[in-house]
Amino acid sequence: MKRGWSPSRTATGGLFAAWAGLFWFLLLSGRWSLYVSTRTFWVVPTGAVLLSIAAAARLASARVPRPESLPTTTSWAIGVIALPVVLILALPPATLTSYALGRRAGFVGSGVNVSASDIASGQLSFIDVAAAQSNKEGMAALRARAGEQVTLEGFVWQEEGAAADEILLTRYVVTCCVADATSAQVRVVNIPPGRFEPDDWVSVTGRIYPLGSEILVDASNVHAIPQPSRPYLTP
Protein backbone atom coordinates (compact mmCIF):
# COMPACT_ATOMS: atom_id res chain seq x y z
CA MET A 1 0.00 0.00 0.00
CA LYS A 2 1.30 3.40 -0.93
CA ARG A 3 2.08 5.50 2.10
CA GLY A 4 1.42 9.23 2.24
CA TRP A 5 2.39 12.13 4.46
CA SER A 6 0.15 12.83 7.42
CA PRO A 7 -0.56 16.59 7.62
CA SER A 8 -1.06 16.37 11.37
CA ARG A 9 2.18 14.52 12.10
CA THR A 10 4.14 16.64 9.65
CA ALA A 11 2.83 19.85 11.22
CA THR A 12 3.59 18.75 14.79
CA GLY A 13 7.02 17.52 13.70
CA GLY A 14 7.65 20.89 12.10
CA LEU A 15 6.53 22.60 15.30
CA PHE A 16 8.99 20.56 17.36
CA ALA A 17 11.70 21.38 14.82
CA ALA A 18 10.91 25.10 15.00
CA TRP A 19 11.22 25.15 18.79
CA ALA A 20 14.37 23.04 18.64
CA GLY A 21 15.82 25.53 16.15
CA LEU A 22 14.94 28.40 18.47
CA PHE A 23 16.72 26.76 21.41
CA TRP A 24 19.78 26.03 19.28
CA PHE A 25 19.77 29.64 18.07
CA LEU A 26 19.58 31.00 21.62
CA LEU A 27 22.37 28.67 22.70
CA LEU A 28 24.76 29.42 19.85
CA SER A 29 24.08 33.16 19.66
CA GLY A 30 24.29 33.72 23.42
CA ARG A 31 20.87 35.37 23.45
CA TRP A 32 19.69 32.90 26.09
CA SER A 33 20.99 35.42 28.67
CA LEU A 34 18.14 37.77 27.70
CA TYR A 35 15.55 35.24 28.87
CA VAL A 36 16.97 32.97 31.59
CA SER A 37 19.56 33.21 34.36
CA THR A 38 22.77 31.22 34.62
CA ARG A 39 20.98 29.05 37.18
CA THR A 40 18.43 27.87 34.65
CA PHE A 41 20.66 27.98 31.57
CA TRP A 42 20.58 24.17 31.49
CA VAL A 43 17.02 24.39 30.13
CA VAL A 44 18.33 25.75 26.81
CA PRO A 45 20.70 22.93 25.72
CA THR A 46 18.38 20.32 27.23
CA GLY A 47 15.41 21.72 25.33
CA ALA A 48 17.41 21.91 22.11
CA VAL A 49 18.42 18.25 22.30
CA LEU A 50 15.07 16.85 23.45
CA LEU A 51 13.04 18.84 20.93
CA SER A 52 15.40 17.82 18.13
CA ILE A 53 14.86 14.17 19.05
CA ALA A 54 11.10 14.70 19.27
CA ALA A 55 11.03 16.41 15.86
CA ALA A 56 13.04 13.63 14.23
CA ALA A 57 10.84 10.94 15.77
CA ARG A 58 7.62 12.67 14.79
CA LEU A 59 8.71 13.29 11.21
CA ALA A 60 9.99 9.71 10.91
CA SER A 61 6.46 8.49 11.64
CA ALA A 62 4.77 11.07 9.39
CA ARG A 63 4.25 8.66 6.47
CA VAL A 64 1.07 6.68 7.05
CA PRO A 65 -0.85 4.05 5.04
CA ARG A 66 -4.16 5.87 5.38
CA PRO A 67 -4.91 9.56 4.76
CA GLU A 68 -5.12 11.72 7.88
CA SER A 69 -6.64 15.16 8.13
CA LEU A 70 -5.47 18.21 10.06
CA PRO A 71 -8.40 19.56 12.11
CA THR A 72 -8.90 23.32 12.13
CA THR A 73 -8.53 23.49 15.92
CA THR A 74 -5.19 21.69 15.70
CA SER A 75 -4.02 24.10 13.00
CA TRP A 76 -4.85 27.08 15.19
CA ALA A 77 -3.16 25.49 18.21
CA ILE A 78 0.03 24.83 16.25
CA GLY A 79 0.02 28.40 14.96
CA VAL A 80 -0.36 29.85 18.45
CA ILE A 81 2.40 27.64 19.88
CA ALA A 82 4.72 28.58 16.99
CA LEU A 83 4.07 32.32 17.36
CA PRO A 84 6.70 32.93 20.12
CA VAL A 85 9.35 31.36 17.86
CA VAL A 86 8.48 33.78 15.06
CA LEU A 87 8.45 36.80 17.38
CA ILE A 88 11.78 36.02 19.06
CA LEU A 89 13.53 35.43 15.74
CA ALA A 90 11.92 38.36 13.93
CA LEU A 91 12.19 41.08 16.55
CA PRO A 92 15.55 42.65 17.52
CA PRO A 93 16.95 41.53 20.89
CA ALA A 94 15.79 43.74 23.75
CA THR A 95 16.32 43.91 27.50
CA LEU A 96 14.30 45.33 30.36
CA THR A 97 14.80 49.09 30.64
CA SER A 98 13.72 51.89 32.97
CA TYR A 99 10.22 51.63 31.47
CA ALA A 100 9.73 48.37 33.38
CA LEU A 101 10.91 49.70 36.76
CA GLY A 102 7.45 50.68 37.95
CA ARG A 103 6.21 47.21 37.06
CA ARG A 104 8.96 45.30 38.87
CA ALA A 105 9.44 44.70 42.58
CA GLY A 106 12.60 45.81 44.33
CA PHE A 107 15.23 43.19 45.04
CA VAL A 108 14.42 41.35 48.28
CA GLY A 109 17.29 38.90 48.45
CA SER A 110 15.34 35.65 48.19
CA GLY A 111 17.50 32.81 46.92
CA VAL A 112 20.69 34.87 47.23
CA ASN A 113 23.95 33.03 47.89
CA VAL A 114 25.69 36.14 49.27
CA SER A 115 26.46 36.15 52.99
CA ALA A 116 27.48 39.00 55.28
CA SER A 117 31.02 37.58 55.33
CA ASP A 118 31.13 37.77 51.52
CA ILE A 119 30.10 41.43 51.68
CA ALA A 120 32.64 42.14 54.41
CA SER A 121 35.61 41.02 52.32
CA GLY A 122 36.80 41.05 48.73
CA GLN A 123 35.81 43.34 45.89
CA LEU A 124 32.27 44.65 46.15
CA SER A 125 30.02 43.83 43.21
CA PHE A 126 26.56 45.09 42.34
CA ILE A 127 25.02 41.84 43.57
CA ASP A 128 26.86 42.27 46.91
CA VAL A 129 25.44 45.76 47.26
CA ALA A 130 21.95 44.57 46.30
CA ALA A 131 22.13 41.70 48.79
CA ALA A 132 23.28 44.05 51.56
CA GLN A 133 20.11 46.10 51.13
CA SER A 134 17.94 43.04 51.76
CA ASN A 135 19.03 42.20 55.33
CA LYS A 136 20.44 43.88 58.45
CA GLU A 137 23.57 41.72 58.66
CA GLY A 138 24.54 42.52 55.09
CA MET A 139 23.97 46.24 55.57
CA ALA A 140 26.06 46.19 58.75
CA ALA A 141 28.89 44.49 56.84
CA LEU A 142 28.62 47.11 54.11
CA ARG A 143 28.64 50.00 56.61
CA ALA A 144 31.94 48.69 57.92
CA ARG A 145 33.35 49.30 54.44
CA ALA A 146 31.98 52.83 54.07
CA GLY A 147 34.35 55.04 52.10
CA GLU A 148 35.91 52.21 50.12
CA GLN A 149 36.23 52.59 46.36
CA VAL A 150 33.96 50.49 44.15
CA THR A 151 33.30 50.15 40.44
CA LEU A 152 29.74 49.33 39.44
CA GLU A 153 28.06 48.99 36.06
CA GLY A 154 24.40 49.56 35.29
CA PHE A 155 21.96 51.67 33.34
CA VAL A 156 20.85 55.20 34.16
CA TRP A 157 17.50 56.00 35.72
CA GLN A 158 16.73 59.56 36.74
CA GLU A 159 14.23 60.01 39.53
CA GLU A 160 11.72 62.80 39.05
CA GLY A 161 12.76 65.85 41.07
CA ALA A 162 16.29 64.57 41.70
CA ALA A 163 19.33 66.84 41.50
CA ALA A 164 20.87 67.28 38.05
CA ASP A 165 24.12 65.61 39.17
CA GLU A 166 22.38 62.54 40.58
CA ILE A 167 21.21 59.25 39.06
CA LEU A 168 20.00 55.86 40.22
CA LEU A 169 22.34 53.23 38.82
CA THR A 170 20.12 50.24 38.12
CA ARG A 171 20.44 46.53 37.37
CA TYR A 172 17.82 43.83 37.09
CA VAL A 173 18.35 40.67 39.12
CA VAL A 174 17.04 37.45 37.56
CA THR A 175 16.83 34.30 39.66
CA CYS A 176 15.03 31.98 37.23
CA CYS A 177 13.90 33.82 34.10
CA VAL A 178 13.24 37.38 32.98
CA ALA A 179 9.61 37.10 34.14
CA ASP A 180 10.76 37.10 37.80
CA ALA A 181 13.21 40.01 37.40
CA THR A 182 13.54 42.42 40.32
CA SER A 183 15.44 45.71 40.38
CA ALA A 184 18.47 46.77 42.41
CA GLN A 185 19.54 50.42 42.57
CA VAL A 186 22.36 52.54 43.94
CA ARG A 187 22.18 56.33 44.16
CA VAL A 188 25.16 57.96 42.44
CA VAL A 189 26.07 61.62 43.00
CA ASN A 190 28.61 63.94 41.40
CA ILE A 191 27.55 62.98 37.86
CA PRO A 192 28.21 65.54 35.10
CA PRO A 193 24.73 67.10 34.58
CA GLY A 194 23.09 66.27 31.26
CA ARG A 195 25.85 63.95 30.13
CA PHE A 196 23.83 60.74 30.26
CA GLU A 197 20.30 59.85 29.20
CA PRO A 198 17.93 57.34 30.83
CA ASP A 199 18.81 53.73 29.89
CA ASP A 200 22.42 54.64 28.98
CA TRP A 201 24.83 52.03 30.32
CA VAL A 202 27.64 53.47 32.42
CA SER A 203 30.54 52.37 34.59
CA VAL A 204 30.81 54.27 37.87
CA THR A 205 33.88 54.40 40.09
CA GLY A 206 33.65 56.13 43.44
CA ARG A 207 33.44 55.77 47.19
CA ILE A 208 30.48 53.93 48.67
CA TYR A 209 28.48 55.12 51.68
CA PRO A 210 25.47 53.26 53.14
CA LEU A 211 23.05 55.91 54.44
CA GLY A 212 20.13 54.43 56.34
CA SER A 213 18.43 51.97 54.01
CA GLU A 214 19.95 53.58 50.92
CA ILE A 215 23.38 53.16 49.38
CA LEU A 216 25.18 56.13 47.86
CA VAL A 217 28.24 56.27 45.64
CA ASP A 218 30.20 59.52 45.36
CA ALA A 219 31.45 59.21 41.80
CA SER A 220 35.00 60.11 40.86
CA ASN A 221 34.82 58.65 37.35
CA VAL A 222 31.81 57.91 35.15
CA HIS A 223 31.95 56.82 31.54
CA ALA A 224 29.59 55.24 29.02
CA ILE A 225 29.91 51.54 28.22
CA PRO A 226 28.17 49.18 25.77
CA GLN A 227 25.34 47.10 27.14
CA PRO A 228 26.90 43.92 28.61
CA SER A 229 26.29 40.64 26.82
CA ARG A 230 24.71 39.45 30.07
CA PRO A 231 22.74 42.48 31.26
CA TYR A 232 20.98 40.72 34.15
CA LEU A 233 22.56 39.76 37.45
CA THR A 234 22.14 36.27 38.93
CA PRO A 235 22.37 35.99 42.73
Regions found by a protein language model. Give the residues of each.
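OB-fold and OB-like single-stranded nucleic-acid-recognition modules
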Residues: 1-235
